[in-house]
């Protein structure tokens, strides 16, 4: 699980 692949879900949670 790379940060780049998990960035999309992480960004949504940060929004």
Swiss-Prot record:
Tissue spec. comment: Stored in spherulous cells in the sponge tissue.
A GO molecular function held by the record: carbohydrate binding
The UniProt record lists the keyword Translocase: no
Entry annotated with the keyword rRNA-binding: no
Domain of life (superkingdom): Eukaryota
Keywords, ordered alphabetically: Lectin
Assembly: Homodimer.
Function: Possesses D-galactose binding specificity.
UniProt name for this protein: Lectin-3
Naturally occurring in which organism (per UniProt): Axinella polypoides
